[in-house]
Amino acid sequence: MDVRQKTSLPWGHQIARGNMFQAHVHHQFGRNVACPTTYVPVSDNGLYRTPQAGAATALRIKAGGNAADTANGAGARSVRLWGINASGDEIVEDIATNGALASSVTTNQFIRLYMAEVLTSGTYGTQSAGSHVATITIENAAGTQDWAQIQLNGFPSGTTGIGSITVPRNHVGLLSSIQINVDQTKTTDLIILKREGILQTSAPYSPIVKMQEFIGVARPISIRFDVPIKFPALTDLGVLAKVSNGTGAVSVDLEVLMLEAET
């Protein structure tokens, strides 16, 4: 394409191409195949860890994986983590896999982890060969808390599914759309929550507040907000879901535009 054609592309295309100064988009996808009848996060393992700044922790890959998911193996060789540190800044760190053993711990200390994905693999991925062999679990350095999972899901997914995200320091998050998919054999209730002031260390704390609620969802729905919902810096944005009976599968896709140097 020539320059004139490129510059005439719509706003969203320019964002996706990285052409908008101090702006980027997160398509934050989450799934939970076993939502119960009480509210839980829409994430692979039903968790989104939110410790206070004083409890920041290094992370690692949990022991118990597959021997092929190792630094020189046929499976996942390294994993990249995205999250927030105790200063409220976004951090990204790569860690080498270590087969069935626990990996080395990260250099960074995390208070949020909103995405992990396979970075390098020993296998050229195809429709019949994925990029990791087993579920990869991310845990705290002490080995006492699971934080996230890169699951198989019938086929190696290569990434986490976490329907929550946190707005870094010196940014504003604009939620412009949400796609919801549910188990159509039952009804599902979902709520979008926000909690500002994630670095607060003593009361009074900012409350956790319901921003949107969807009751009795029985089919996929897609909602675009003509005026996006604003989430200020240092704010958690999360989706919880519950089903009417038993357990059920739920997935969400959040389109969040992050604007830097905004208040």
For the regions a language model picked out, list residue spans one by one.
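Beta-strand-centric surfaces of beta-sandwich/beta-rich domains
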Residues: M1-R112, L119-T263
